[in-house]
Design a protein with these regions (language model features):
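Autoprocessing domains of the Hint superfamily
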Residues: 1-133
């Protein structure tokens, strides 16, 4: 779930809490896709990014890396550097810092019609994909 950050849309970056169903966002293939559903839930287990402090995701989020999707739960309870997939550049090294919040914050899970993820503050973050036949 995305707790804090700006999702890349066809109109430019937009705060996650403002993303609505039907909106067009940019998927991990750098293609436009439609948001089919936005689910909201409280989160306490998080991953912070040392070089991207305005991005905060839940521990169960998928993170797009140079080598494929990394499940956030696999990040050990100490800081770990990963080569993260970006929209502007092929990849970028950043240090992932798992942690626990003092109080729960709202997180948002997006379901899109294609792409397996979206760009948030420049990094690829996994989301649900639901295709229609």
């Amino acid at each position: 779930m995305i707790i804090k950050g700006n999702v890349l849309t066809n109109q430019g970056p937009k705060p996650i809490e403002e993303i609505q169903e039907g909106e067009i966002v940019i998927n991990l293939g750098n293609r436009p896709c439609r948001v089919l559903k936005v689910e909201k839930a409280d989160c306490t287990d998080v991953i912070r990014f040392q070089n991207n402090p305005d991005l905060l995701v839940s521990r169960d989020s998928g993170l797009a890396t140079r080598y494929g999707m990394l499940e956030g739960g696999a990040v050990q309870p100490h800081a770990k550097e990963e080569m993260l997939y970006q929209c502007e550049a092929p990849c970028f090294f950043d240090t992932l810092e798992p942690g626990i919040l003092d109080k729960p914050l709202p997180g948002y899970e997006l379901t899109v019609d294609s792409g397996k993820g979206v760009f948030v503050n420049g990094y690829g973050i996994g989301c649900k994909e639901e295709t229609h036949a």
